[in-house]
């Protein structure tokens, strides 16, 4: 029997660009902060900071901003996201995810302004009998408003973060590799373990980049004056 249901378009694969940072041997952080500014948006795109837990290499989480993101209240649009693999509880607008492992994700509507930079923050919270809690916030650096994305609990041994990296990804409908919609994001040098007054125990420098096999793009280190940033261009030829 032939189905009369419309065929679902395939999702694009391998359209990503990664920026890798060097903390010069330091690892095991209870906090990581980083700013991002998305100066050119594209549909169905994700700009994120990601990390592993030192106790479980290859297993960690990510946070960032998406266009056309799907939220747990069944709405879509610009979205702030915080996700941890193997999370067992959440506080906020959170729910399960799958496809690339399993865990929990917190998602909320959050408008992306191309003229504004945002501080991404992940921070270790309290522990309880069920495990270790982590929280994520996004701050609009123009208004100074901090917004909590949510809190997630992971197994008790996941108490420290490894060195972070960044990625820009297109996750929309499959297109030709040279037709991936172009986006541009600036990720500043991430820093760890905030000491107050804008200072940190650990800083980083840009190391290298990698790109998926089905997209154009590049990463360039640029000097912003107060800091440097990885300018991540994804898509195009």
Give the location of each predicted region.
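Secretory targeting and sorting signals
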Residues: 1-9
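Secretory/extracellular carbohydrate-interaction modules
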Residues: 10-94, 107, 193-237
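Residues embedded in well-ordered secondary-structure elements
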Residues: 23, 109-111, 125
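Short beta-strand segments enriched in hydrophobic/aromatic residues
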Residues: 36-40, 124-126, 140, 170
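Lectin-type carbohydrate-recognition ectodomains
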Residues: 72-75, 79, 87-89, 96-98, ...
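Short, aromatic/His-centered strand-loop micro-motif at the edge of beta-sheets
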Residues: 95-119
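Localized edge beta-strand/strand-to-loop motifs within extracellular or lumenal beta-rich domains
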Residues: 113-134
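Aromatic sugar-binding interfaces of carbohydrate-active proteins
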Residues: 130-219, 224-227
């Amino acid at each position: 029997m032939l189905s009369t249901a419309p065929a679902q378009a395939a999702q694009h694969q391998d359209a990503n660009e990664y920026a890798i940072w060097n903390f010069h041997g330091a690892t095991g952080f209870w906090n990581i902060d980083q700013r991002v500014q998305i100066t050119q948006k594209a549909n169905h795109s994700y700009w994120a900071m990601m990390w592993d837990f030192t106790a479980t290499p290859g297993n960690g989480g990510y946070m960032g901003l998406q266009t056309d993101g799907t939220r747990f209240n069944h709405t879509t649009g610009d979205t702030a996201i915080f996700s941890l693999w193997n999370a067992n509880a959440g506080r906020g607008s959170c729910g399960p995810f799958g496809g690339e492992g399993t865990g929990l994700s917190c998602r909320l509507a959050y408008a992306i302004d191309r003229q504004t930079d945002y501080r991404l923050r992940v921070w270790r919270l309290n522990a309880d009998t069920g495990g270790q809690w982590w929280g994520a916030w996004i701050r609009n650096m123009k208004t100074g408003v901090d917004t909590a994305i949510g809190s997630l609990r992971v197994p008790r041994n996941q108490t420290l973060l490894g060195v972070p990296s960044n990625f820009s990804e297109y996750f929309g409908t499959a297109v030709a590799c040279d037709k991936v919609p172009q986006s541009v994001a600036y990720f500043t040098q991430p820093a760890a373990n905030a000491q107050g007054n804008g200072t940190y125990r650990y800083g980083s420098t840009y190391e290298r980049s990698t790109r998926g096999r089905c997209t154009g793009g590049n990463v360039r280190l640029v000097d912003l004056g107060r800091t440097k940033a990885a300018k991540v261009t994804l898509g195009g030829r």
